[in-house]
Regions:
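A conserved regulatory-domain signal marking ACT and ACT-like small-molecule sensing domains
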Residues: 1-189
Length: 189
């Protein structure tokens, strides 16, 4: 949610052993939010840079009843022309691999975003993953991994597909149109 709209507020919760490193994670969070920002800043300078960019940054204490082990939750609020958007993402490192474990209300994701990844959100209904797979296959693209959690409250699904090669913007747009996607984007990390 929010796309490339200006970020106004970021709240982070550090769980487990990451709590003791939270101030040292401020600079990598800044770099992830604002790729053009100065790299390698000390914690206080990173917080100042966030303020200079008009971003309120808050490191929250976790609620003791949350069993998220060593993970980080980022809640990002964006605003443009008095319209507000909110995105929440939780990440964890599993077997040495950084994974997104939750995106907004899509729990149990555990997606490795390294390489080429497609993210498509749509109204949940049968056959959508087959349509996506068929379109990729027709273009010689193989699926390396897939996660497709549903949000039963909104009746939406999020499909995160890791492919063996980049997917063109044209193909992604074609797939998004065919499945009537609410949102669709690709990452190359």
């Amino acid at each position: 949610a929010g796309g490339n709209k200006p970020i106004r507020r970021v709240e982070c919760t550090f769980y487990g052993n990451l709590r003791i490193f939270r101030k040292w994670l401020t600079a990598p969070i800044l770099e992830g939010l604002l790729p053009h920002a100065e790299k390698g800043l000390m914690p206080a300078a990173a917080e100042e840079s966030l303020r200079e960019h008009g971003i309120v940054f808050k490191a929250r204490e976790p609620k003791d009843d949350k069993p998220y082990e060593d993970s980080i939750t980022l809640d990002v609020a964006m605003e443009e022309e008095e319209e507000y958007f909110h995105t929440s993402v939780r990440g964890v490192v599993t077997e040495g691999i950084p994974m997104v474990s939750r995106l907004n209300n899509f729990n149990g994701l555990y997606a490795d975003l390294r390489g080429t990844t497609l993210c498509l959100r749509y109204k949940d209904r049968p056959g959508i993953i087959a349509l996506i797979g068929s379109a990729l296959s027709s273009n010689g693209i193989n699926i390396d991994n897939i996660a497709a959690p549903a949000d039963h409250a909104t009746r939406e699904a999020l499909t995160v597909i890791k492919t063996n090669q980049p997917v063109s913007d044209e193909l992604l747009d074609k797939i998004a149109k065919e499945i009537d996607a609410i949102s669709a984007f690709s990452l190359n990390l």
